[in-house]
Amino acid sequence: MNQYIQGRFYFLFLSIVSGLINLISQGESDSQAEAIKMGEISVSANRIAKETFRTPNSISVIEKSQMERITATITPQILAETVGILAQQTTVGQGSPILRGLTGYQTLLQIDNVRLNNSTFRSGPNQYLSTIAPHGLDRIEVLRGPNSMLYGSGAIGGVISVYSHRLNYRNDKKFSLVPLANLRFTSAQSGRVGMLGLHGGTNDLAFFVTSSVRRFGNQKLGSGYNLHYNNRKFEIVGDKPDPLPKNSWIKKDEEPLGWSGIDATAKLGYKINKDQQISFCYQTWRQPELNRYDKISTKEYELYQFSPQNRNLLYATYESKKPIKFIDEATVTLSYQQQLEGRKQIKATNLNEQKEQFDEVGTFGLSGQAVSTSLPQQRIIFGGDFYLDRLSSRTVKTNLATRIEQVDSDWGRFPNNSSASDLNLFAQSEVEVWSDLQLVLGGRLTHYDLQADLSSRDTSFGLYQKSGQALTGNTGVVFSITENLNWVANFGTAFRSPNLNDTTVVEVTNEGIDAPSLDIDPESSWTLEAGLKANFSRFIGAATLYHSEIRDLISRVPVKEAYDGKDLPKLYKDIQLENPDTEIFIQDNIDQTQIRGIELSGTVVLNSRLTMYGHGTITRGRILKNNGEPPNPEEFWAERIRREAPPMGMIALQWKAPKKPYWCKFYVRGAMEQRRLSRGDIRDPRIQGKTRDPKLVEFDENGLALDAGTPGWYTLNLRGGVKLGQLVRLNMNIENLLNRRYRQHGSGISSPGFNLTTSLSTSF
């Protein structure tokens, strides 16, 4: 951006801000301003409801009203405006939150306290949070930082807890019935979403039912073009190059990206008596097919689809107050979750063969916890959980000329009949040392098992079995400097056991093809964080500094590099023979990795009508040691972590007059450039550049890539809503007013250009 355009942008922004403040504050005194409170209640930080201001953890809570105003089409998009989160998208209809430099299986996801993660989750960004529809949610809690002590394996980067619509019991026996409806339209994707729901009940019976359907078209981008190279890399350019570079092509919009889906949720609750209740929930998601754009745009594949992406969840929860003398409350949940994922591929070099792989994971879960305040000045939470995965996997190859199918029932992406399980016991104590000082202490013991038979592909690999134990802990401090200002600190350890994706998968990735890797160790980490939390009448906010070190971080290594000078096993040779133009990778442990960062967020009430909100995040990662040695200082990429988030943030001004049915919001989102690239980033077709060879990338003296990486970006946006009578709400969101073309770091698709989203909701 030249200085003239940049100057105009800042002048426009400051003019809008000044105009809003002057217009809205006319005739008002400070005494008329409404007070705000840090009334956010979180469950995920302590596995029991507690005010976030009084916890040592870094937590964000997104309430139902906020989600309705954001008008997201998939659940990960709701998190894009949350401090500390980079909402990556490999393709449309999918999204993966990156917390503190980690994503995929290093971030734990759960729905209604039932674990969503299973043993097939991969290391990079995945699509599984998108299988929870944004309609019918009550709130989302984001716990940043390690919490294996409460949630077990995988909670290294953080925990994202999604809660479905709560059951509402009446105060009397009269039966109530409330219909719900929502229509949503988006212009940039020609998207349509429709939802119908029903909730009601009596004083001892409550239910909630909702279902939605959605259909989206191709994605319209901002001004400019995508310039693709035949080495699978690309760049965003403002004008068409004339002439085009050799072996390159131009794309104005990104297609084919149309997709559709359907979901449904049903909940039923019954109060047995005043101290006991039981609830049941069924949830389903159906996504018939979805194109993976970064595989198609590179012309590597003629067809690459997730087909299908389905999920079913059924659980029952029993809750009891005072079941025995020293227990205040207890909860037990029994669950079964089924996830079916299919991949459909046609390579550009072999148009006569279609390859389909189907992986179905059935997960049985049992969890329970109890809360006791029988000891003076403390609250104890203890419990355990058990999860068991059973995997069915197969491959179907079809000759498109003859329509003859060849079925391999022994192996899809994984060996058929593989299994994984983990058993956990935990306890945590909150101790009030005195009125201004609170300590939180806890620990968890985990035992895990993996089993897979690889002998059908290579008898030398045979039956793979791995088990182990881990002990993790947590210590937190909350010190009240004043009634409205807390100093908090937290030290926690976390771990992640290798899963089936680490050890047994044969899968196409953005770098090449992953192959089985049996000789890897669990990841472990420790994190120290400290900061301030403010809760004043007209300002709430938080500032957090953190430092993490991860031992044995699992990362890809080219198989030829790992077996340098040695003969490759038959399995690897066979995979290479099937994919002669694709590099094969296995997993290995990185000795020591460091991630540091700062997270800032705050809300200020300027007067009774105008509120300002903002947040910012900086993340820095570094590999300290690998194979017993520090990285080569001349190879800048060797010390970088994968997908390090750029400095990013948001600032917003919201106007809402007291007792008025309408509101509006102007906000700016953006990120600085990210040119701190790892070897995997340089090879990744989703990250801009001209070459996939790190040795051909130019770097400056600070180790920043000069001709690769993600440029900085910002968008100007408007959002508003009005209540039409007592039953109908209309919300509108205008994104990317300047129609800029940009892509989030690590994403496989560009973000929409000028985009109008309209949402019409009613509750009869």
Predicted regions and their residues:
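Gram-negative outer-membrane beta-barrel transporters
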Residues: 432-439, 447-448, 546-549, 571-573, ...
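Transmembrane beta-barrel wall of Gram-negative outer-membrane proteins
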Residues: 187-216, 225-288, 310-312, 374-378, ...
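Structural signature of Gram-negative outer-membrane beta-barrels, strongest in the C-terminal barrel
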Residues: 271-273, 377-381, 385, 416-551, ...
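Short acidic/polar hinge/loop motifs at secondary-structure boundaries
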Residues: 116-146
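Outer membrane beta-barrel strand-and-loop segments of large Gram-negative receptors
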Residues: 359, 363-370, 422, 517-521, ...
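Conserved C-terminal beta-signal and adjacent last beta-strands/turns
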Residues: 269-271, 307, 314, 489-492, ...
